[in-house]
A protein has these predicted regions:
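Bacterial N-terminal signal peptides
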Residues: 24-34
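A beta-rich soluble binding module of mature secreted/lumenal proteins
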Residues: 2-11, 32-198
Length: 198
């Protein structure tokens, strides 16, 4: 009887170990894939130079974006960048989720990929895993920015003001189109609510 119980326990323990090993393998695979996300600009796109982070930091409002799960359905999206003493950049993304009736926030960290006078950074919201963030076009007065990610499926139009003149928007979108971005898939972002943190 005790041998039978012992055998059952050993079998259960072995099953638990197998499940844990499967989970570990999945986690390692996810970490590997996340680590493979490129941090350099997409081929054919050059990040803005010269780039002044002191002028770039502060709050930006998202006017348009290509759809991704981490922002899906959000309105009133803003991104705030703050230079830290260690040279990194604190990133705070906020947006309103109408389906849940609540504000959502994600806090991350950005680091320069190369020279600090080039608008090419890598951003992480999940521990050691970074993705590319590249300022592909920038207003001389730092009033608007066109940002692309690790590939052309990531694109954002950012402005200092909540609302953007339609003619100016079309000019920025035309720049994105010239860079090979599928601008027909851009989603316009409304800004009708007041963020309680602002």
């Amino acid at each position: 009887m005790f041998e039978r119980i012992g055998g059952v326990l050993r079998g259960a323990a072995s099953s638990v170990v197998r499940v844990r090993l499967r989970w570990l393998a999945l986690l390692l695979a996810a970490a590997f894939l996340a680590g493979c996300v490129p941090t350099s600009p997409p081929e054919g796109i050059t990040a803005v130079t010269p780039f002044d982070l002191q002028r770039y930091q502060g709050r930006w409002y998202e006017q348009a974006r290509l759809d991704h799960s981490f922002e899906r359905g959000l309105t009133d999206v803003s991104a705030t960048y703050q230079l830290q003493p260690d040279g990194s950049v604190r990133v705070v993304n906020r947006g309103f989720d109408p389906a849940k009736g609540e504000w959502r926030e994600a806090v991350g960290k950005a680091l320069f990929v190369g020279e600090h006078d080039t608008g090419s950074l890598k951003v992480s919201f999940f521990g050691p895993f970074y993705g590319g963030y590249h300022v592909a076009a920038l207003d001389p007065g730092y009033r608007w920015a066109l940002v692309v990610g690790p590939d052309r499926s990531y694109c954002w139009v950012l402005t200092r003001d909540k609302h953007l003149d339609p003619a100016q928007r079309e000019a920025i979108v035309a720049r994105a189109r010239a860079l090979g971005i599928d601008t027909s898939a851009l989603i316009s972002v409304s800004h009708e609510r007041q963020d309680p943190t602002q």
